[in-house]
UniProtKB/Swiss-Prot annotation:
This is Auxin-induced protein 22D. Induction: By auxin. Pfam families: AUX_IAA (PF02309). It comes from Vigna radiata var. radiata (Mung bean). Its main location: nucleus.
């Protein structure tokens, strides 16, 4: 019975699956690990240990410690990841685009467009006309958008609503937070309507 139990334990390889409170790869018992630590132990404890092991302390000092397995989570890479993520965010904000929400009075849905795709106001307005199936007409600084019941407006960084086309294109792209296509009657206070 005992032979069959012993062979069964060998087959299970209990030693390999045993849970210990040591570093990975250290197969030595806990007592020997404490003897090799950098901390000093009391002289009585070291005498007792050498007597119980039946060996001299000098023999243990000559033994080369086993190669240590790399500890999980070392070397620390958190700062590397932080810096890497920051660089990616900066690249995305500079190169990939600037998406803004576009809403239209009376439309039950919103759209998002990338302002970096367009090079000027006429391109942007043409895209908005195609997207919402409406016509804005011609823009003039004096009269706003003529021949249309809708006026494209935008909210800048300060939270002010302005007519699209009031400022130079580059300034518009850098300051636009969202676009709204208002009815001409709503946009009277913003421009020359």
């Amino acid at each position: 019975m005992e032979n069959s139990l012993g062979s069964y334990e060998k087959e299970l390889n209990l030693k390999a699956t045993e849970l210990r409170l040591g570093l990975p790869g250290s197969d030595e018992p806990e007592k020997r690990a404490t003897a090799r630590s950098n901390k000093r132990s009391s002289p009585e404890a070291s005498d007792e240990e050498s007597i119980s092991n039946g060996s001299d302390v000098t023999k243990e000092d000559n033994v080369v410690p086993p190669a240590k397995a790399q500890v999980v989570g070392w070397p620390p890479i958190r700062s590397y990841r932080k810096n890497n993520v920051q660089q990616k965010k900066e690249e995305e904000s500079e190169g990939n685009g600037m998406y803004v929400k576009v809403s239209m009075a009376g439309a039950p849905y919103l759209r998002k467009i990338d302002l970096k795709v367009y090079k000027s106001y006429p391109e942007l307005l043409k895209a908005l006309e195609n997207m919402f199936k409406c016509i804005f007409g011609e823009y003039s600084e004096r009269e706003g958008y003529n021949g249309s019941e809708y006026a494209p407006t935008y909210e800048d960084k300060d939270g002010d609503w302005m007519l699209v086309g009031d400022v130079p294109w580059n300034m518009f792209v850098s300051s636009c937070k969202r676009l709204r296509i208002m009815k001409g009657s709503e946009a009277k206070g913003l421009g020359c309507f």
